[in-house]
């Protein structure tokens, strides 16, 4: 029993330290994003397949958009990491989530608007330092590509993370 507690605490500490190091490398410019043209709808579909395909997952995700394809400049790997982090509950969270990723395009502002509704990660925005740092990492990524990142823990439909990407 004590061994399990030590193992769990050690893993949490390691995640925390790794998150701090990652944020530090981002802020110092030591990590460079790949700036490439990507089909955002395809990337979202791949993340949905990954999250919905997890064994014993407590998260089910659906995509709501009228867009068949939409290209934008981003880093494919970091975009994947961004969405997966939003859809991953914290270690001790056993609640079930029916998350929705909504995407719409605003032609006048040349931007894609994303709402990740009922996102498990939005619920823990200020819960612990590790999640706070992960939100900072996510925001850094979105800001790098000219977007906005916002967490709403008390949104009407459920905890929501909203962000934009220029297109």
Residues of each region from the PLM?
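Conserved glycine-/histidine-rich ATP-lid loop and adjacent helix of the Bergerat-fold HATPase_c
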Residues: 137-146
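Conserved catalytic submotifs in the C-terminal HATPase_c
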Residues: 34-39, 58-70, 106
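Short alpha-helical segment of the dimerization/phosphotransfer core of two-component systems
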Residues: 8-13
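Helix-loop junction within the histidine kinase core
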Residues: 20, 24-35
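Short beta-strand/loop element within the Bergerat-fold HATPase_c
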Residues: 98-110, 117
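A conserved beta-strand-to-alpha-helix junction within the catalytic ATP-binding
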Residues: 34-49, 80
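Glycine-rich ATP-binding loops of the HATPase_c
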Residues: 101-102, 146-152
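Glycine-rich/acidic phosphate-handling loop/turn and adjacent ATP-lid/helix
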Residues: 112-135
């Amino acid at each position: 029993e004590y061994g399990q507690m030590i193992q769990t605490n050690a893993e949490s500490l390691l995640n925390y330290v790794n998150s701090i190091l990652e944020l530090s490398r981002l802020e110092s410019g030591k990590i460079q994003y790949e700036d490439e043209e990507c089909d955002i709808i395809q990337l979202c579909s791949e993340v949905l397949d990954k999250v919905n395909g997890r064994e014993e997952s407590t998260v089910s995700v659906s995509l709501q958009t009228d867009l068949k394809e939409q290209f934008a400049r981003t880093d494919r790997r970091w975009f994947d990491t961004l969405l997966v982090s939003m859809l991953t509950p914290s270690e001790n969270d056993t609640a079930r989530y029916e998350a929705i990723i909504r995407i719409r395009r605003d032609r006048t502002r040349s931007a894609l608007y994303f709402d990740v509704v009922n996102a498990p990660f939005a619920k823990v925005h200020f819960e612990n330092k590790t999640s706070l740092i992960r939100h900072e990492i996510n925001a850094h990524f979105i800001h790098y590509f000219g977007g906005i990142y916002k967490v709403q823990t008390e949104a009407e439909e459920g905890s929501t993370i909203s962000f934009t990407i220029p297109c």
